[in-house]
Curated annotation (Swiss-Prot):
Belongs to the UPF0165 family. It comes from the Archaea. It holds the Pfam family AF2212-like. This is Putative antitoxin APE_0472b.1. InterPro entries: AF2212-like. Possibly the antitoxin component of a type II toxin-antitoxin (TA) system. It comes from Aeropyrum pernix (strain ATCC 700893 / DSM 11879 / JCM 9820 / NBRC 100138 / K1). Keywords: Toxin-antitoxin system.
Length: 61
């Protein structure tokens, strides 16, 4: 079992790192903590994710 951080956008949890090892598996999610994030940083981060970049190193989210 591993701990994965993510962001919620429009009701969907977006992981902050690729989850290729979980592809096709059913998972159970437990929310331990919730923090607010800067909307401008979030938009830039999500744009890079859509372009296929690993954006975690660029932003402190």
């Amino acid at each position: 079992m591993s701990e994965i951080e993510g962001i919620v956008k429009s009701g969907v949890i977006i992981p902050l790192k690729p989850l290729t090892e979980l592809e096709g598996k059913k998972i159970k999610i437990k929310i331990v903590d919730a923090e607010s994030v800067d909307a401008e940083k979030l938009y830039s981060y999500l744009r890079l994710l859509r372009e296929g970049e690993d954006a975690r190193d660029f932003f402190k989210i």
